[in-house]
């Protein structure tokens, strides 16, 4: 009778569902079992592997010490490294972007298409097409021609600005200037208004024949689009903040005359700054 503490020999069973117990590791035959007589050989092989690992670790250690000697150290003892752009380079990958076009902007997009795609193709070196089936504009980078890593995002912002309702010239400014942004908010984000109250708030922002909107744009050097209850502002960071304050005050019920007075102060500050 076998003692309860004795160990039984493990029997090697082939994996079910595979023909002839074939291995799932291609190129290496690891289905052979190890006999008890081959234990010494296995131990010798392990020792050889350990010595090989020690040799590799020694080579890597010497390589690291050699690389550490080439690092430039400043006066304070801190290492100085070259810029990543010079060492690694800018690698452009195949990337694509799809910008959906609202139905009411499809006709302006078709009419201005001959002026929209040249900046994307010639300046940003992107591949662009208008998909009429899905009503979208598709952009794609090409590593052979595209050089700017942020070209795809710039092109997407340009198309998005046009679909929001901005003029073509104002949208192209996003490609030329890096400090332009678009901020979007709704009237209900400022104050919950419905029915005629909402219509009057939008009317106060626009003014008669767009007079108030143009005054805010000229004073703050921004561009404003009123799309129903949504308001889109294009401009610099500080300019957007000034225009947003004027629009918010109009939504909250401030009379246009008071807003005009604040705009004069804002315009004088901008003239002093620039």
From Swiss-Prot:
Stretches with biased composition (Basic and acidic residues): 51-69
Tell me the Gene Ontology biological-process terms attached to this UniProt entry: endonucleolytic cleavage in ITS1 to separate SSU-rRNA from 5.8S rRNA and LSU-rRNA from tricistronic rRNA transcript (SSU-rRNA, 5.8S rRNA, LSU-rRNA); endonucleolytic cleavage to generate mature 5'-end of SSU-rRNA from (SSU-rRNA, 5.8S rRNA, LSU-rRNA); proteasome assembly; ribosomal small subunit export from nucleus; ribosome assembly
* Coiled coil regions, renumbered to chain: none
Q: Where is the KH domain?
A: 195-247
Q: Where in the cell is it found?
A: Cytoplasm; Nucleus, Nucleolus
Q: Where is the composition biased (Acidic residues)?
A: 33-48
What this chain does, per the entry, is described as:
Required for small ribosomal subunit (SSU) synthesis. Has a role in the processing of early nucleolar and late cytoplasmic pre-RNA species. Recruits DIM1 to nucleolar pre-RNAs. Indirectly required for cleavage at the A2 site of the 20S pre-rRNA, forming 18S rRNA, and at A1 and A2 sites of other pre-rRNAs.
Tell me the protein's name. Pre-rRNA-processing protein PNO1
What organism is the protein native to? Saccharomyces cerevisiae (strain ATCC 204508 / S288c) (Baker's yeast)
**Gene giving rise to this polypeptide:** PNO1
């Amino acid at each position: 009778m076998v003692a309860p503490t004795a160990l039984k020999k493990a029997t090697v069973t082939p994996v079910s569902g595979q023909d002839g117990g074939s291995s799932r590791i291609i190129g290496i035959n690891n289905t052979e079992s190890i006999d008890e007589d081959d234990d010494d050989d296995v131990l010798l092989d392990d020792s050889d592997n350990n010595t090989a690992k020690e040799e590799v670790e020694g080579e890597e250690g010497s390589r690291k010490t050699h690389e550490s000697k080439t690092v430039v150290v400043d006066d304070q003892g801190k290492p100085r490294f070259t810029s990543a752009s010079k060492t690694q380079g800018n690698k452009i990958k195949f990337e694509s972007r799809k910008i959906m076009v609202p139905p009411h902007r499809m006709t302006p997009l078709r009419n201005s298409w001959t002026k929209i795609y040249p900046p994307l193709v010639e300046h940003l070196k992107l591949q662009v097409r208008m998909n009429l089936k899905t009503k979208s504009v598709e952009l794609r980078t090409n590593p052979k021609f595209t050089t700017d890593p942020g070209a795809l995002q710039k092109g997407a912002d340009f198309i998005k600005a046009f679909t929001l309702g901005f003029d073509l010239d104002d949208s192209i400014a996003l490609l030329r200037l890096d400090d332009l942004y678009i901020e979007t908010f709704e009237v209900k984000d400022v104050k919950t208004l419905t029915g005629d109250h909402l219509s009057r708030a939008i009317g106060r922002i626009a003014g008669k024949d767009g007079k108030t909107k143009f005054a805010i744009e000229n004073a703050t050097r921004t561009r404003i689009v009123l799309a129903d209850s949504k308001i889109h502002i294009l401009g610099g960071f500080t300019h957007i903040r000034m225009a947003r304050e004027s629009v918010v005050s109009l939504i909250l019920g401030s009379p246009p005359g008071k807003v005009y007075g604040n705009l004069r102060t804002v315009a004088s500050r901008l003239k002093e700054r620039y």
